[in-house]
Amino acid sequence: MLAATVLTLALLGNAHACSKGTSHEAGIVCRITKPALLVLNHETAKVIQTAFQRASYPDITGEKAMMLLGQVKYGLHNIQISHLSIASSQVELVEAKSIDVSIQNVSVVFKGTLKYGYTTAWWLGIDQSIDFEIDSAIDLQINTQLTCDSGRVRTDAPDCYLSFHKLLLHLQGEREPGWIKQLFTNFISFTLKLVLKGQICKEINVISNIMADFVQTRAASILSDGDIGVDISLTGDPVITASYLESHHKGHFIYKNVSEDLPLPTFSPTLLGDSRMLYFWFSERVFHSLAKVAFQDGRLMLSLMGDEFKAVLETWGFNTNQEIFQEVVGGFPSQAQVTVHCLKMPKISCQNKGVVVNSSVMVKFLFPRPDQQHSVAYTFEEDIVTTVQASYSKKKLFLSLLDFQITPKTVSNLTESSSESVQSFLQSMITAVGIPEVMSRLEVVFTALMNSKGVSLFDIINPEIITRDGFLLLQMDFGFPEHLLVDFLQSLS
């Protein structure tokens, strides 16, 4: 449960210092609620089993003075686990303190070799080696604290308790006298309990931090593409309340390994609820940075050639057989070219009505003429304001165009005079086809990008994307991310 909690909590972290203040300054906030922890708790057994199996159990040696036998030297060697099962587990959040995990009835069978020796009254040395099994029943109590260490989530379990309900030593074949079994059962049980507690608690803590690093590395991959990445370093220690865990992240975009260290807005915990499993809060500054790096990387452009241009028009119900279209394309629609690109960085803001995008674009049409030696070029510069609402369903991102306004800036014909009817026709083409086509292509691009990063592997349930003045909120339920746990456990082997 501990590691599974970290699996979802740990978004990403690069090496930056953590603030120890109480204010919540962040570009991105992640909140995981109690219902999510209950889902993650279902897979406790796999993580605890891994901790038991990965733990190294040192040899236990000593000696004991026995009546008639003198000094008996003993050693338990090559201690390994041969069987493990877990009955149940529970998780509780302790306000401003820790995640408390209770694991009941862990049945573990250890095996190894018992070596002992003593000298008889006749000065005869006796040395024996016997295979053994230790049958144990254990309860675990793990109280885990989450901290920020150089911008990353770290875990620490200063309170880790093992309670033994059963600890029975079985010697191979029971060939030795009963006093041997009694000696080692009674005498070494205390030492064995201390060794097991120390090694198991240590390994649980190690695995938790390995998983935190694993998830943060995976998140770094999900949130990057080419020269673009995101700095989601923690801005402070994660917050624990009785109903949720919450982490606060910078959310600065990184372009070609350079990050803008902009002032962060202040986040109010009242902006998020606790009825859904998982919440993400994004400041509109995150989208402003996204627009900037996308513009710098040359991604805000579109080019359509020939038959593809005609097919796009027909997809949106544009009549390519009308006379004016044939006149404009000069009878060679298969050789027409259209390019669209942003003239400057778009401005993105979050409002109650949706995400508002202000952009200045240039649209250029190039149509060949019958002599194949000349072309007619039309160029439009326009300011476009679109209001968009996003949704996610069936592993796909959908963008709904709620409203748009187009303000023409300049229109030019680079080769010949053009009639107002031609300009009006091309303008209507931009409005009726251009904007919907760009929206459609963005849907495809973003969906493909998310799927390439493995987002489609997550069982996302009833996601909602909500815009408010100054921020965007994503809230959802989810099924256990089995694929992440499988990948993590395989990485340990």
From Swiss-Prot:
Signal peptide, first to last residue: 1-17
A Pfam entry, by short name: LBP_BPI_CETP
Gene Ontology annotations of biological process type: cholesterol homeostasis; cholesterol metabolic process; cholesterol transport; high-density lipoprotein particle remodeling; lipid homeostasis; lipid transport; low-density lipoprotein particle remodeling; negative regulation of macrophage derived foam cell differentiation
Disulphide-bridged cysteine pairs: C160-C201
CDD domains referenced in this protein's UniProt entry, alphabetically: BPI1
Keywords: Atherosclerosis, Cholesterol metabolism, Disease variant, Disulfide bond, Glycoprotein, Lipid metabolism, Lipid transport, Secreted, Signal, Steroid metabolism, Sterol metabolism, Transport
Tissue: Expressed by the liver and secreted in plasma.
Glycan attachment sites: N105, N257, N358, N413
Effect of substituting V433R: Reduces activity by 60%
InterPro entries hit by this protein: Bactericidal_perm-incr_a/b_dom, Cholesteryl_ester_transfer, Lipid-bd_serum_glycop_C, Lipid-bd_serum_glycop_CS, Lipid-bd_serum_glycop_N
PROSITE patterns (alphabetical): LBP_BPI_CETP
GO function term, MF aspect, one: cholesterol binding
Keyword Cytoplasm: no
Reported impact of S247A: Reduces triglyceride transfer 5-fold. Slight reduction of cholesteryl ester transfer
Keyword Signal tagged: yes
Subcellular localization: Secreted
Catalytic reaction list: cholesteryl (9Z-octadecenoate)(in) = cholesteryl (9Z-octadecenoate)(out); 1,2,3-tri-(9Z-octadecenoyl)-glycerol(in) = 1,2,3-tri-(9Z-octadecenoyl)-glycerol(out); cholesteryl (9Z,12Z)-octadecadienoate(in) = cholesteryl (9Z,12Z)-octadecadienoate(out)
SUPFAM superfamilies: Bactericidal permeability-increasing protein, BPI (SSF55394)
Any one Gene Ontology cellular component term annotated for this protein: vesicle
Disease affiliated with this protein: Hyperalphalipoproteinemia 1: A condition characterized by high levels of high density lipoprotein (HDL) and increased HDL cholesterol levels.
Function: Involved in the transfer of neutral lipids, including cholesteryl ester and triglyceride, among lipoprotein particles. Allows the net movement of cholesteryl ester from high density lipoproteins/HDL to triglyceride-rich very low density lipoproteins/VLDL, and the equimolar transport of triglyceride from VLDL to HDL. Regulates the reverse cholesterol transport, by which excess cholesterol is removed from peripheral tissues and returned to the liver for elimination.
Family: Belongs to the BPI/LBP/Plunc superfamily. BPI/LBP family.
The protein's name in its UniProt record: Cholesteryl ester transfer protein
Native source organism of the sequence: Homo sapiens
Organism lineage string: Eukaryota, Metazoa, Chordata, Craniata, Vertebrata
Gene: CETP
